[in-house]
Amino acid sequence: MNKEKLIAFFKKETILCISGALAVVSAFIIPPDAGYIEYCDIRVLVLLFCLMAVMGGFQQLGVFDRMANLLLARARKMRQLATTLVMLCFFSAMFVTNDVALITFVPFTIMLLERANLREKMIPFIVMQTIAANLGSMLTPVGNPQNLFLYTISGMEMSEFFAVTVPYVGVSYFFLYVYCYFQGKQPLVTEKQEPKKQWSGNDKVFLLALGILFLLCLLAVFRIAPYQAIFVVILVWFIFFQKGILKGLDYNLLLTFVFFFVLIGNLGRIPVIRETLQNLLLGREVIVSFLASQFISNVPAAVLLSEFTTRYDLLIAGVNIGGLGTLIASMASLISYKYYAQAEGARKGRYMLYFTAMNILFAVILLAVNLFIPYLPVVHLA
């Protein structure tokens, strides 16, 4: 039974297990010493924790469900339904992360399409929601873990960050909208789904408090307020008022970051590896980070490659485009797949074919943007 549990854990947390094993192996090459203390970027870990906690609080209150219900009540045609479901993920991911957007809206989409007898739309809509969440999250530093990490270690100004991301996100929005538009004018009837529960007086107080905590998180991300103080405030709130949220956070993601911090720290102290990776990245930051993301996922790719280049603008572009491609290129994509695989009548093979085809299409489009628009700050491939 223990063996079965270990196998199940490995399947669920593959990246965590591999990163942990690699960190241990690297520790045999570079034995633990005082230098290890400098490996971990505490600010990144703290901000990730704070954002996950606040988003968990919003989710528990049903904020995102209510928002979806209000928007879906306006849908009268297939293209309107597609636009609503896809753009919900696209825009919400900019502020609540791609993971939270998909965890919230994919189950909602499955339920809605089942009730509306539109199962044939389940694969295309969920795949496009996944692409939309990954690309929408590219816009802001808080949209996904790799952005938060790279923005934090780079010291970039907000204007510099947006100069990198806005062109890609703008192009992504255009093509996502075109896709939704061509879903057609087929009339449909969608009923407004009542929230699971009405907000009580306490819920409203919690909602206000969480809104304030989210603003404090943003102040810390943008380096306006000290992250240490924000961490204390958020930790105290959740310990005393929403302790259950703390139990459900994705601590494995934080631990994965720690393992990769150790790994890249040790690799950086091995001269031959450091020189090889620096030479490999030089002038090829976008394509190398894109390809690395296909095999190890874009968050680990960002952490790993950041040690060997100072072109964080190119790295931001590469790992975000790198979220398109294989199912593991962005770990958020696995969330959608797992939800779909549990749906009645799921056709996993067809899902994978459609997922791969659409991801490749959008990846090619965005790589073309990188290559052929010379005024983009990230175009330094030669």
Question: Which ranges hold each PLM region?
Answer:
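Hydrophobic transmembrane alpha-helices that form the pore/transport pathway of multi-pass ion
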Residues: 87, 91-135, 149, 303-317, ...
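Long, contiguous bundles of hydrophobic transmembrane helices that form the permeation core
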Residues: 2-4, 174-235
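Membrane-interfacial loop-to-helix junctions in multi-pass transporters
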Residues: 41-44, 73-86, 115-125, 204-208, ...
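Transmembrane helical segments that form the transport core of multi-pass membrane transport proteins
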Residues: 39, 61, 65-68, 212-310
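Interfacial loop-to-helix junctions that mark the boundaries of transmembrane helices
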Residues: 5-12, 34-44, 156-168, 199-203, ...
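Hydrophobic mid-bilayer segments of alpha-helices in multi-pass membrane transport proteins
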Residues: 4-29, 41-53, 206-215, 223-238, ...
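Membrane-core helix-loop-helix motifs of multi-pass transport proteins
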Residues: 118-185, 190-197, 338-368
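C-terminal transmembrane helix pair
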Residues: 162-177, 287-382
